[in-house]
């Protein structure tokens, strides 16, 4: 999900780790 001018939150794995880019 690419949102212009906003950060992307990526949910990785069953642990629900959140990576903000």
From Swiss-Prot:
Region listing for Disordered, in residue ranges: 1-21
- Residue ranges that the Swiss-Prot or TrEMBL entry lists as coiled coil: none
Could you say which protein family the record assigns here? Belongs to the jacalin lectin family.
User: What is the official name of this protein in its record?
Assistant: Agglutinin beta-2 chain
What is the purpose of this protein? D-galactose-specific lectin, binds the T-antigen structure Gal-beta1,3-GalNAc (Thomsen-Friedenreich-antigen-specific lectin). Potent and selective stimulant of distinct T- and B-cell functions. Shows a unique ability to specifically recognize IgA-1 from human serum.
Subunit info here reads: Tetramer of four alpha chains associated with two or four beta chains.
Q: Name one GO molecular function term.
A: carbohydrate binding
Q: What segments bear the compositional bias annotation Polar residues? A: 1-10
Q: Which UniProt keywords apply?
A: IgA-binding protein, Lectin
Tell me which domain of life the UniProt entry assigns to the organism this sequence originates from: Eukaryota
